[in-house]
């Protein structure tokens, strides 16, 4: 009897800060003037006048993007991107790497549980879970490459041959012209804007309904910015506009509020989930049966491993799963699952009127729905089918310099300091002072401040 061949194990984990805007997994780290950050969009911070104008004013892009590479013992490399910037790199190596080195990359359930449970005392939601997500996606990319198969074939195969998209952006008429089956538009005003804001919201949605006609599905993204009474009133005032669904009307923590708005408008569809994390967070949303669609983000909730568990729960209640954005990572999931009827495309061009890669210039061959759809043929490459753009790779900043910085001398040393070494073997020379170029400028984001510093150290 032939023995089972030895499968490669995990040899190394590397992480990189992605320098610059418009590249990588942080959707909101884009140039000024982009519709995602600099148009009227109601947000949880819209209750304060100084944070209405731009979403960057309250820090939506503060973390930036990062990339994780996982190398197997045979030299095969899987990778994935997400949001988290320098703090993400720190946790990858200072905490999660211990569970990965020497492990069998096929043990995705085990590795997820170890990372999730080990970070439970400070995690469960938010950044720690988003970091686990990127590690998990890099593992799936590695597995696909080791087996020479696309990820969708590893998680059940194709449930359909064609993947249809709706488009989220500022101009539903443009989405219709580009071939998308429907469009979702962000709501501009919140309850703090009072009666005038309510009236403007209705007028805004009426304008877009008229621009696309009565038969084109129109959805509304409220981005966690409303409350129960406001949602009920707004939905009532828009009944004649035939809104296909109302998305993320309430705070992610107000799960009971969805019961109230569904009771008030049982004939309407309400959705949420992009800011929920792990199967535990989704359990109550699903069991309540107050949501018509759930919308997890595979780059945030725990990766492909956890998304499959959430989808299985939702399938038992016949609740469709329509992931939030996430490019190719979502596409492989959606095309493999029977209860995932379509996918979101988040318009990445500055004006939202053209189709560009979700991850900017990071990848050479990111599939994009140029006519509102993709097919399995577009996804038939090993792993997630992505290749890092050499130009973008040249701008990646290794976290070696973040994790092993050259010390700045604040007090005069009594003895000659020892020369440390980086993992690469290069000497780390003690510095006499913090160079001016490493000091954060006023208003700089966290990623800008740290990347400026590590660039200087890398050049030293």
Locate each region found by the language model.
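Glycine-rich, aromatic-flanked loop segments that form ligand/cofactor-binding clefts
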Residues: 127-130, 136-170
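Metal-dependent enolase-superfamily TIM-barrel catalytic cores that perform enediolate-based chemistry
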Residues: 156-261, 265
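Shared catalytic-loop signature of beta/alpha-barrel
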Residues: 35, 48-49, 242, 253-375, ...
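Conserved, mostly hydrophobic/aromatic
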Residues: 10, 75, 96, 135, ...
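Short beta-strand elements
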Residues: 66-72, 367-369
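Metal- or metallocofactor-binding catalytic centers and their adjacent structured scaffolds
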Residues: 54-56, 71-146, 350, 415-418, ...
